[in-house]
């Protein structure tokens, strides 16, 4: 389509993000067809700027965990994440345009923001994205988008550089279990970008089971 090669704000996905991470609390499956990973109107969906609110619409109406889970998705899934000022602390959440969504943030809130759980979790996942090209530019292959759980690969290869990230997301209020068979997981050494723990996947019958904490994320790296 005309102008399909231009990087733009990802409005179709934005509406889904608000439903999944806002008070509607829809399941991860709501995001699947808005990703356009295989076919769609965009020449390159990986260059779209992903977001859940901005100055021209109501801010995301979510509790702290909603923001944390939204950021865990934005900084691990396809696209270029964009965070509107103040959302790193849940500022004026739910407020509409001209009803508070553009209010002055101020130095006092900036100083206090470092103690916000939204900010601390955002800082962590943003740093992990910054350090790993698979999360920035890797192809996304979905394994599971259902209810409170999501699992997908980000696969990057350029020249002699290669990295695979297995992303596990849990937006539920209880720990969630994940298991993968030999057809889903490559044998060899994997390392958690979250904890630093290493895992050796057996080459004879590779399988893996793990648990992701409530409102948590796991990123396993294979290089």
Residue ranges and their predicted role:
Residues 1-44, 48, 64-65, 73-76, ...:
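Active-site-proximal helices and loops of the catalytic beta/alpha 8
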Residues 168-172:
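Asparagine-centered strand-capping/turn motif at beta-strand->loop junctions
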Residues 55, 74, 86-88, 125, ...:
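Conserved, mostly hydrophobic/aromatic
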Residues 52-59:
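Active-site neighborhood of divalent metal-dependent phosphoester/pyrophosphate hydrolases
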Residues 148-150, 163, 214-219:
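Short hydrophobic/aromatic beta-strand or adjacent loop that forms the aromatic wall/cage
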Residues 47-49, 80-83, 164-166:
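Beta-sheet entry/capping signal
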Residues 202-223:
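C-terminal beta-strand-rich structural cap/linker in extracellular carbohydrate-active enzymes
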Residues 191-207:
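Solvent-exposed beta-strand/loop surfaces of large extracellular or lumenal domains
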